């Protein structure tokens, strides 16, 4: 059984946390994140350590306890280090460009796809076929990267499309001739 909720969250240097009516605000060198948590879970801040306590050991409380701890830890990591997801484009003529805060993708359609960067998200292009999505919120970084990938998901026959770096795409064999 998982005991993630019982682990102590250690705050790195430069990270401050405040809790008011279970609305937690985490401030760090990269920015500030605020999130409301369940009233059932008690969040205690003691110096540079944060502990979470549940009122009883019911199944619902255990699940909320672990989830709350994971979300809070992601907030702490986000404001201190940040998160990033890398995507790569494979295909003839597939490339990306930046126009201000807008990502413009040429992925074999009759028109270019434009993706506006949500608040707190930055796009970087180390080369025209690699996209780096970075920010302080793990949730928003993941959703933005998934949206960019969904514009041209990798297809199983030639492997063309937008994929995460290191993602394995299952390939299929094409039709065989007579």
UniProtKB/Swiss-Prot annotation:
- Coiled-coil spans are none
One Pfam family from the UniProt entry?
Ribosomal_L6
Q: Which GO terms describe its molecular function?
A: rRNA binding; structural constituent of ribosome
| Purpose | This protein binds to the 23S rRNA, and is important in its secondary structure. It is located near the subunit interface in the base of the L7/L12 stalk, and near the tRNA binding site of the peptidyltransferase center.
By its UniProt entry, which NCBIfam families does this protein fall under? L6_bact
Family classification: Belongs to the universal ribosomal protein uL6 family.
The protein's name is: Large ribosomal subunit protein uL6
What is the native source organism of this protein? Streptococcus sanguinis (strain SK36)
